[in-house]
Design a protein with these regions (language model features):
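Short, extreme N-terminal segment that most often corresponds to the first beta-strand
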Residues: 7, 16-51, 55
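N-terminal low-complexity, intrinsically disordered "leader/linker" segments enriched in small/polar
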Residues: 47-53, 58-69
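Low-complexity intrinsically disordered segments
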Residues: 61-162
Length: 162
Protein backbone atom coordinates (compact mmCIF):
# COMPACT_ATOMS: atom_id res chain seq x y z
CA UNK A 1 0.00 0.00 0.00
CA UNK A 2 1.25 3.51 -0.77
CA UNK A 3 2.17 5.65 2.22
CA UNK A 4 -0.39 8.26 1.22
CA UNK A 5 -3.48 7.38 -0.74
CA UNK A 6 -6.50 9.26 -1.91
CA UNK A 7 -9.57 9.42 0.27
CA UNK A 8 -11.11 5.97 0.67
CA UNK A 9 -14.77 5.61 1.52
CA UNK A 10 -15.04 4.00 4.96
CA UNK A 11 -18.79 4.33 5.13
CA UNK A 12 -20.25 6.17 2.20
CA UNK A 13 -22.77 8.22 4.16
CA UNK A 14 -20.78 8.94 7.30
CA UNK A 15 -17.09 9.67 6.90
CA UNK A 16 -14.00 9.34 4.79
CA UNK A 17 -10.55 8.27 5.84
CA UNK A 18 -7.06 8.95 4.61
CA UNK A 19 -4.33 6.37 5.06
CA UNK A 20 -0.84 7.40 6.11
CA UNK A 21 1.67 4.58 6.56
CA UNK A 22 -1.26 2.11 6.47
CA UNK A 23 -2.96 3.71 9.47
CA UNK A 24 -6.38 5.31 8.96
CA UNK A 25 -6.89 8.95 9.85
CA UNK A 26 -10.48 10.05 10.23
CA UNK A 27 -11.71 13.35 8.88
CA UNK A 28 -13.98 15.54 10.98
CA UNK A 29 -16.10 17.10 8.26
CA UNK A 30 -17.66 20.53 8.71
CA UNK A 31 -19.37 23.36 6.89
CA UNK A 32 -18.41 27.04 7.25
CA UNK A 33 -21.12 29.58 6.49
CA UNK A 34 -21.93 33.26 6.64
CA UNK A 35 -25.49 34.41 7.23
CA UNK A 36 -26.66 36.96 4.67
CA UNK A 37 -29.14 39.80 5.27
CA UNK A 38 -32.11 37.76 4.00
CA UNK A 39 -31.36 34.85 6.39
CA UNK A 40 -29.83 32.65 3.70
CA UNK A 41 -26.41 31.12 4.32
CA UNK A 42 -23.50 31.02 1.88
CA UNK A 43 -21.13 28.21 2.82
CA UNK A 44 -18.18 26.02 1.93
CA UNK A 45 -17.33 22.45 2.92
CA UNK A 46 -14.23 21.91 5.13
CA UNK A 47 -12.80 18.37 5.25
CA UNK A 48 -10.15 18.03 7.97
CA UNK A 49 -10.22 18.83 11.71
CA UNK A 50 -13.66 20.43 11.82
CA UNK A 51 -14.08 20.13 15.60
CA UNK A 52 -14.40 23.35 17.68
CA UNK A 53 -11.07 22.87 19.49
CA UNK A 54 -9.25 23.33 16.17
CA UNK A 55 -11.42 24.77 13.39
CA UNK A 56 -13.52 26.87 15.75
CA UNK A 57 -10.40 28.46 17.21
CA UNK A 58 -8.84 29.01 13.77
CA UNK A 59 -12.02 30.74 12.56
CA UNK A 60 -12.29 32.99 15.62
CA UNK A 61 -8.59 33.89 15.55
CA UNK A 62 -7.93 34.29 11.81
CA UNK A 63 -11.29 34.75 10.08
CA UNK A 64 -12.97 37.21 12.41
CA UNK A 65 -14.34 39.91 10.10
CA UNK A 66 -17.08 39.79 7.50
CA UNK A 67 -14.50 40.49 4.79
CA UNK A 68 -12.15 37.68 5.86
CA UNK A 69 -15.01 35.18 6.23
CA UNK A 70 -16.45 36.16 2.84
CA UNK A 71 -13.06 35.76 1.17
CA UNK A 72 -12.58 32.33 2.77
CA UNK A 73 -16.00 31.07 1.65
CA UNK A 74 -15.72 32.61 -1.82
CA UNK A 75 -12.89 30.16 -2.56
CA UNK A 76 -15.35 27.26 -2.28
CA UNK A 77 -14.95 23.83 -0.72
CA UNK A 78 -11.60 23.07 0.87
CA UNK A 79 -9.48 20.42 2.45
CA UNK A 80 -8.44 22.82 5.21
CA UNK A 81 -8.70 26.56 5.84
CA UNK A 82 -5.33 26.74 7.61
CA UNK A 83 -2.51 24.88 5.91
CA UNK A 84 1.13 25.71 5.22
CA UNK A 85 1.10 24.01 1.81
CA UNK A 86 -1.24 23.79 -1.17
CA UNK A 87 -1.58 20.16 -2.23
CA UNK A 88 1.96 19.30 -1.16
CA UNK A 89 3.62 22.37 -2.66
CA UNK A 90 4.87 25.48 -0.92
CA UNK A 91 2.38 28.34 -0.73
CA UNK A 92 2.79 30.97 -3.46
CA UNK A 93 0.22 33.44 -2.12
CA UNK A 94 2.63 35.15 0.29
CA UNK A 95 0.91 33.72 3.37
CA UNK A 96 2.48 31.36 5.89
CA UNK A 97 -0.89 29.64 6.39
CA UNK A 98 -4.11 29.73 4.41
CA UNK A 99 -6.83 27.68 2.73
CA UNK A 100 -6.21 24.60 0.64
CA UNK A 101 -9.10 24.83 -1.84
CA UNK A 102 -10.19 21.91 -4.00
CA UNK A 103 -10.23 24.34 -6.94
CA UNK A 104 -6.41 24.54 -6.65
CA UNK A 105 -6.28 20.95 -7.89
CA UNK A 106 -8.79 21.53 -10.67
CA UNK A 107 -12.09 20.66 -8.99
CA UNK A 108 -15.22 22.78 -9.43
CA UNK A 109 -16.54 23.18 -5.87
CA UNK A 110 -18.01 26.68 -5.52
CA UNK A 111 -19.73 27.96 -2.36
CA UNK A 112 -23.28 26.79 -1.80
CA UNK A 113 -26.28 28.98 -0.97
CA UNK A 114 -28.90 27.58 1.42
CA UNK A 115 -32.20 29.40 1.87
CA UNK A 116 -32.16 29.07 5.69
CA UNK A 117 -30.51 27.34 8.66
CA UNK A 118 -32.63 24.22 8.28
CA UNK A 119 -31.35 23.70 4.75
CA UNK A 120 -27.79 24.59 5.85
CA UNK A 121 -27.95 21.98 8.63
CA UNK A 122 -29.09 19.20 6.28
CA UNK A 123 -25.66 18.41 4.82
CA UNK A 124 -24.45 15.54 7.02
CA UNK A 125 -21.28 17.22 8.25
CA UNK A 126 -20.23 16.64 11.85
CA UNK A 127 -19.93 20.33 12.77
CA UNK A 128 -21.35 23.51 11.27
CA UNK A 129 -20.16 27.08 11.79
CA UNK A 130 -22.10 30.25 11.03
CA UNK A 131 -20.66 33.77 11.07
CA UNK A 132 -23.55 35.99 12.12
CA UNK A 133 -23.47 39.64 13.23
CA UNK A 134 -19.68 39.60 13.69
CA UNK A 135 -19.54 36.40 15.77
CA UNK A 136 -18.97 32.71 15.15
CA UNK A 137 -21.56 30.14 16.23
CA UNK A 138 -20.67 26.43 16.29
CA UNK A 139 -23.06 23.48 16.13
CA UNK A 140 -22.51 19.79 16.80
CA UNK A 141 -24.65 18.13 14.18
CA UNK A 142 -24.77 14.78 16.06
CA UNK A 143 -24.00 13.13 12.73
CA UNK A 144 -23.69 9.66 14.21
CA UNK A 145 -26.80 9.85 16.40
CA UNK A 146 -30.25 9.31 14.93
CA UNK A 147 -32.92 11.92 15.47
CA UNK A 148 -30.80 14.35 17.52
CA UNK A 149 -31.12 18.02 16.61
CA UNK A 150 -28.07 20.23 16.05
CA UNK A 151 -26.68 21.49 19.34
CA UNK A 152 -24.95 24.82 19.91
CA UNK A 153 -21.44 24.21 21.26
CA UNK A 154 -18.80 26.52 22.68
CA UNK A 155 -15.66 27.36 20.75
CA UNK A 156 -12.71 27.21 23.18
CA UNK A 157 -10.93 30.51 23.62
CA UNK A 158 -7.35 31.23 22.66
CA UNK A 159 -5.27 30.93 19.53
CA UNK A 160 -3.58 27.68 18.57
CA UNK A 161 0.19 27.49 18.68
CA UNK A 162 1.51 27.18 15.14
Amino acid sequence: MNELTTFDPFHSDLLYIKRVKSKPLMATRSRIGIELKDGSILSAYHHWDGYPQWLGRILETNYNTKEKVSELIDGGDMSSCWNDTVWGKDRTDGQKYGPEYYSARGEDCPPRLDKDMEEFFSDNEEYSYIFRNGNWFAYDMHQFEDMVAPESVEIPSGALAV
